[in-house]
Design a protein with these regions (language model features):
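A short, basic/flexible loop-to-alpha-helix module at the beginning of a structural domain
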Residues: 1-3, 157-171
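N-terminal FAD-binding dinucleotide-binding subdomain shared by FAD-dependent oxidases/monooxygenases
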Residues: 2-5, 10-13, 19-148, 165, ...
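Aromatic pocket-lining residues of Rossmann-like dinucleotide-binding sites
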Residues: 21, 189-190
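Active-site "gating" loop of Rossmann-like NAD(P)-dependent oxidoreductase/epimerase domains
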Residues: 149-153
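Short, surface-exposed connector motifs at secondary-structure boundaries
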Residues: 170-173, 315-316
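Residues forming the flavin
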Residues: 173-189
Length: 475
């Protein structure tokens, strides 16, 4: 099969890319490893899995898709996201151009034919002029190695491989290793199972924020839909894809009373408002950042009555600058961790030594991972415009010059160093969650509008690229 564009991945990015490329006259096709659309939402069915970007921003902004779709909650769960992608498929007729259960094992660019040669796990060969990798940042799951893990006689399951049919945890001893977003969501569900004895191994503190989950009526959404166009525009123009009316002054220009009142308002709103609505210097001024942590700790400590657990989950000393690691949204995480049937282990002090047939052994005693759709749409729009430009100018292939790549890398790292992100080295933002991986900023921290400006300015001419016009003609 031969296409103008081959897209790898059938999540938000792949679906929107296929739709936009079709509109621009390209023949396009998606190769999807799973059996359905949805990407991360097709793969994840673990207890409590749900989106942490609030309605209506975590969806495609296409009117033909949202006009007949109604969300049931402010933060929809994985089952509802699966139904949403079924709806997207029905409206946009995505599946007619998708190869499901197909894994790409190789992709090479043939300079003679100026085409990509893509090989799948079945041996099928696909060719295309352009290749779009819409695989997302969570496609490859990380499973740490532990001595003796193969000896364990119980069930070991990575959340991304949690069976759709579920696992019966009633009256079971359960261990959760990790306290990131997935760990938080699993704890909130598993800790409440009848007869469960839960042990949670915590490596890094999670400065989790209140979700403020609630049901949303169809009437409320119908009212919101009248201003969806404005809301989506505000989201696109915002730094993180989630609009918030934050203050324009720096922290030191405010009084304690003014700060506390504003933070209380953000806290009541829930979601990521406590982060996106902060004073302008919170990622630059360490003292301003410390004040935010102290407020968070004050609001959170009272929810954990057990002093040993409280010292692990809400330490007196700020563990890292707030906002430099993605905070998780929680509903009753701290109350669940405080339950008598839940044990909390600080693995920095009591590390995991090995696994045995019956469980996990620590060093001192045995005991039982931006609002994506908004950003994705803008990236796809940029890519589509770029491919149209190449087609109009009859350009066969294009590749960034090494000097341009190095300049971009330095730009990304320079912004990182100028902010308090440089003081936190355990975040997945810098690859800190993978042992042995080089620690460097993996995200552009200048915000979505500036990122797109950089992209468009960098491609307004071909000075940063090696360009081929017609096969074999380098410019």
């Amino acid at each position: 099969m031969d296409y103008d564009v081959l897209i790898i991945g059938g999540g938000f990015g792949g679906c929107y890319a296929l739709h936009q490329l079709r509109k621009s006259g390209f023949s396009a096709h998606i190769v999807e490893a799973g059996s359905a659309l949805g990407g991360v939402w097709h793969r994840n069915s673990y207890p409590g899995a749900r989106v942490d970007s609030e309605t209506p921003y975590y969806q495609l902004s296409l009117r033909e898709v949202w006009k007949d779709w109604t969300w049931s909650q402010r933060f929809p769960g994985h089952a509802e996201l699966k139904r949403y992608f079924t709806h997207v498929d029905k409206v946009l007729d995505i599946s007619k151009d998708v190869s499901y259960n197909t894994v790409v094992v190789g992709a090479d660019f043939d300079t003679v034919t100026a085409k990509w040669i893509i090989e799948t796990d079945s041996g099928r060969i696909i060719t295309s002029r352009f290749l779009v990798t819409a695989t997302g940042s969570s496609i490859k799951r990380y499973e740490p190695e532990f001595a003796g893990k193969d000896l364990f006689k119980g069930i070991i399951v990575h959340p991304a491989a949690w069976p759709v049919s579920g696992i019966d945890l009633e009256n079971k001893r359960v261990a959760i290793i990790g306290s990131g977003a997935t760990g938080v969501q699993c704890v909130q569900e598993i800790a409440k199972q009848p007869g469960v004895k839960l042990t949670v191994y915590v490596r890094n503190v999670n400065i989790a924020l209140p979700m403020r989950q609630r049901e949303i009526s169809e009437l409320e959404q119908d009212s919101l839909k009248a201003i969806y166009k404005t809301l989506f525009r505000l989201a696109r123009d915002s730094s993180a894809g989630l609009p918030c009316d934050g203050p324009t002054q720096v922290t030191k220009e405010t009084t304690t009373e003014e700060r506390e009142a504003w933070w209380e308002e953000l806290w009541k709103r829930g979601a990521f408002n406590f982060q996106t609505g902060q004073y302008t210097d919170f990622l630059v001024d360490a003292e301003a950042n410390r004040l935010i942590y102290e407020f968070w700790a004050k609001k959170t400590k009272c929810r954990v009555q057990n002093p040993k657990k409280r010292a692990i989950l809400v330490p007196d000393k700020q563990p890292f600058p707030f906002g430099t690691k993605r905070s998780s949204l929680e509903q009753d995480y701290y109350e669940c961790m405080d339950q008598d049937n839940v044990e909390v282990v600080d693995v920095k002090k009591t590390s995991i030594r090995e696994w045995t047939a019956r469980g996990i052994v620590t060093e001192d005693a045995p005991t039982a991972l931006t609002n994506a759709p908004v950003f994705i749409e803008q990236q796809v729009d940029f890519i589509t415009d770029f491919l149209v430009k190449l087609r109009m100018e009859k350009i066969t292939s294009i590749e960034p010059r090494r000097s341009a790549e190095e300049h971009w890398k330095k730009t990304v790292q320079a912004i990182h160093e100028a902010l308090l992100f440089s003081k936190s080295d355990t975040s997945w933002y810098v690859g800190g969650n993978i042992p042995g991986k080089k620690k460097e900023q993996l995200n552009y921290l200048g915000g979505i509008p500036q990122y797109l400006k950089e992209c468009r300015e960098g491609t307004k001419d071909w000075s940063n690229f090696n360009v081929v016009v017609g096969v074999g003609n380098a410019v």
